[in-house]
Amino acid sequence: MSTLGATALQFTPLDALCGGAILGVATIAKLMLTGRLLGVSASVKRPAQGEFFSWDFAFLGGLLAAGAFHVATAGPLPAEPMVGVGRALLAGSLVGAGSAMGNGCTSGHGICGNARLSPRSMAYTGVFMLVGFIAATVFDTAGALNIASASAINSTTIPSLASLSVWAAFAAASVGAFIGLGALATSGKAAGGAAYATDELSGGLVSGVQSELKPPWQPSIGPRKRLVNVVADGLVGFVFGTGLIISGMTRPVKVAGFLSALHPAWDPSLALVMGGALALCAPGFYFIQKYQKAPVCSLEFGFSSNSKLDKRLMAGGVMFGAGWGLGGICPGPSIVALAMVPSPAIFAWVGGMVLGMVVNKNLLSTRQQSSLSAASL
């Protein structure tokens, strides 16, 4: 349980919408430039399960950089209420195993999948939201985080014009940077040697992108596009992480306030975060699928055609929702929080997430081996 004083929640609709819109900008840019769907849990799961790709590290590094940059510009932050270390470890383990089983989280399914009207993503999101509400209510996550009973809606706050201006400028600068990366990737051959040199200095990480993967994840021919492919993911991580901070998603009390629907301090801000992201991603993804033949730096888009609603997907949604409701945090915000407000609880949560992903892989491998052995008898 948090040892801090009671936290009074405030309904922050514009913060949530603006932060969500910035999440949408990063998500669309990643798809247009690299052809990959943004999924934080996937970028954690691959290295956790022994698959190492440079863009995953770039993306996760961008999330960490967003947290560090916020501290550098805003100054030391007050300690953020978190559940106890043991509960955080359990919550992270459930989220890690659930996201691995369901192949996604609040970003991969909640934003990317729902923006494409994916039946799997809509089902998974519905399950983890419902279970999250139940877990937060039954196990009193609001109480564990010492959330005050005062109404959040009655304490609605609007950001200052200065804050809105900074966020708008950041979003515009991000769009400009993504456009610049796209232009760099497609402009002539003059910088080819520089790109090769950069690849050599990076220990072959950039060229590894091309040698390790097949389409749709293999970048297009040329060192420049291979380099931009990785740099783009780093910038996407930074922009996405900043959107998480602005929206309040890095604060477990905000998430728990939303999931605790029966609590007097119920805070609907989180719904507007997803709404802001989907308001951009839904038309953005439609435009990309209809009019963009290929990503800027890859051969094909990585859209999944799987629409099967199986037991593994549903079980993953249940586990993810349970962990989310118990701890009030999900993969993306947890990575940002490591650099922004590090604490034993957040390290335990992230460690639990990785553990859940590793255990899930080992159990799956054991089942597959057992099935093969049974089939050979």
Residue positions per predicted region:
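Membrane-interfacial helix-loop segments of redox and metal-homeostasis proteins
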Residues: 1-377
